[in-house]
Structures are given as structure tokens and as C-alpha cells.
Swiss-Prot record:
Residues 88-203 form the Rieske domain. Rieske-type iron sulfur protein that can catalyze in vitro the 2-hydroxylation of putrescine, forming 2-hydroxyputrescine. May be involved in the biosynthesis of the cyclic hydroxamate siderophore alcaligin. It comes from Bordetella bronchiseptica (strain ATCC BAA-588 / NCTC 13252 / RB50). The keyword Oxidoreductase applies. Belongs to the bacterial ring-hydroxylating dioxygenase alpha subunit family. This is Putrescine 2-hydroxylase. Binds 1 [2Fe-2S] cluster per subunit. Keywords: 2Fe-2S, Iron, Iron-sulfur, Metal-binding, Monooxygenase, Oxidoreductase. Its cofactor is [2Fe-2S] cluster.
Amino acid sequence: MRITTPVNPDGVQFPVWDRPDRFFFAPERHERHDLSRPGFFIRAEGIMTDIGRMAHVVPARTQLPVSAYFDEARFAREQELIFKQSSLYVGHQKLVPELGDWRTLVQEDGGRALVRNQRGVELVSNVCRHRQALMLGGEAGNVSGNANTRGSLKDTGGNIVCPLHRWTYNDRGELLGAPQFDATPCMNLQRFRLRDCHGLLFEGPRDPAADMAPLFARPEFDFGDYVLDHVEVHQCNYNWKTFIEVYLEDYHVGPFHPGLGRFVTCDDLAWEFNDWYSLQRVGVHQALAQPGSAVYKQWHDRLLDFRAGQAPDFGAMWVTYFPTHMIELYPHVLVLSTLYPKSPQETLNVVEFYYPEEIVAFEREFVEAQRAAYMETAIEDDEIAERMDAGRKALMLRGANETGPYQSPMEDGMQHFHEWYRRVMGETED
């Protein structure tokens, strides 16, 4: 993102978009600011500028037509132009922490699996080369669903063994034996290249470590002592872009989320934008003194108990690595949430919950309270997204198209996403 910084008569610089009809703060609306007070910050290409808390409306020139959320042809183009050209999150190394551990990819109905071997973590096909059966995971009546998705090769002598005919592969997918064949066929499992970004594993043509280098230079993004506690698989009956839009706007947090809206405050919202990601940081609402729901009260209480009554330094940090990977930081919590679009109106959300090892081992109530609060907000977000797509569908069916303005700074992240989307799709503004 490129910004310019014109100087007003008082000599104070204000960032302005590189087109005259798009701005964060117009010099003609200027009033003198005390730069020492908290405010809203936006960082772009190394520039950090205070532009105060003065909200304004930005014209909706980059928003998408209502048909974009339902069109099968567009969905197919997205697969080619976005998903095949991006870094796609596969899983974290900590999903398979011990030698011999395996975990099938639920987002692919178990068709591939992460396996930890002497070389590290590898991604291999979970489909036997003999009769193309799924091997690891699953159970009778649910062979490809979210059941029995992890285990250890120690149970099968360190090897991957097909349950149908006992074809046996080593932990790298190399065929060791095929019963009652005169010679072992040269038929190994396919392996897939992974790119490691501080333990997060991606595949695709981009380099996620380079894309997110400024992000992982921040001390908050060191998760060395965190361990996996739980993986939630959540079905979303709306378009993947709608999910990202809701995630990237804070305008609804106060009005729609009674629990989250009393856990965080958007009064000190700060954005950081980069070519392939955005980061939003929000503060703590009144030192957690007024929980907004019964579920969030449990989370407030457990968090304050763990911190001996001391309120945390921040409420949340929400990252979106385009197109669909989200890194969410809460006090003593890491959540990795990733969308896997299945159709224009069907999206799978796989959510991984990580905590410091000490909390997982000794603070079960903390873990359960945080996850319950998170899922309460997730269900509320589902309603927002479902209402948005239902309204868009109603407009589309009557042959109409409507888009509203962006509220700035609350919806700057949504605007940034729309700009990125149009760029990679090769589309111009409406």
C-alpha cells in the first residue's frame, strides 16, 4: 500500500491515499493533535502516523458486486487466480509434536496427512496406491470425516499400513511391502512441499516467511512455549469473502458482540497493513471490570485469576494473511483459524487453540472458559455473515446491486482486503 504525506500550513503531515478521492484524513479537516496521547495508528511501508480518532466515511468504490458471493464462475476463477497463487495454510508443526505422530487434514476429508519423521514434518498422500483407499484415520461409518484424525505410527511399527490389504509404507511414504506380490511395486505415496514460517506450515508458490517477516519480527509473535490443546471444525454457510469482511471490520464489535465488546475496546484500534496481510490491535475494555455475557464473565474471571488480578496489556491482535489464514492473539492465547472454501456458499473453518504449556497442564478452567467465549463470538459472527449474504442474495434476485460506504477507521481492514482482492483478480474498481 502506498500513501503520501502532504503537509498542511501548520507543518503537520497527514497520510492521504494516492488517489484524491481516497483518504484516511483530509488536511482540510485538520485540527491540531497532541501526538503524545493514544490514538489510532496506521503503519504502511514503515511509516507510523497518528491520525487521531476522528471517524469519517470513505466512498465504497472497491466493494464487490452482490453477485460476487454466489457466482460459480467467479468461484472457479478465485481458485485459479487466488488460491493456486497464494500460500495456503496446512497446519502447525505442533499438530504432530512427537516422532511418528500423524494427523489427517480434515479440510481435505483425510486425503492427506502430516507425519513427523526423522526429517521433520512432511505432508504425504493418505491414499493407498493399490486400491486408492484412505489409510490413516477415520472409523466405520465415518471414514473421511472429523473422527480419529490423529495418532502415532508407533502403533503400526513406525509405518503407514493400509487396513484393506496391508500394503505398508515407511514414515516418508515409501512402499516397503505388498503382501502376496512376487515383487514390491515401485509405488510410493506422493509427498508435497511445505514452507515453514515459524512453525506454521504452508504450501503454494509464495514464501510466507518473507510475506510476514515484519509480523514475526514482533516479540508478541514468539509462540515457542505454546502447545496445541484443541482443534475445532466449524461449518460456515456463507461465502469465504464474507467471513473475511466480518473479521476485518470492528464497526460491529460494540453493537453486536455483548461479550467480546466488553472484553476489548476499539477506542485505541490500530492497523498495520502490508501487501499480503493486515494486523489490527485493540485494547482491554475497562480492565475487564464489566463482562458483557455470562460466558465472557467466566473468561474474565479465569484470566484475572491467572494474572493475580492484573488486567492484560492488550485485548486482541487479529492478523489476516490473505487469502484465508488468521492468526489471533489474546492474553496467553494463540488461535489459528483458516478458511477452506468448498463452494460459493459453503466454507469450512478449522480453528486451532494453543496456550502456554503451563496453562494446558494446570489451568483447565482457563482453557475451557476462553474457548467457550471464542465460540460464543464465532456464532454471533455467523449470524452477521448469514444476514449479509441473505441480503445480498435478495438484491441479486431482484436484479439490484447496492454497496455502502466504509466507516474509517473501523472498516479500513475490509477496504484493504477488497483492494487486495481486486488486484489479484485483475479487476478494476466499480
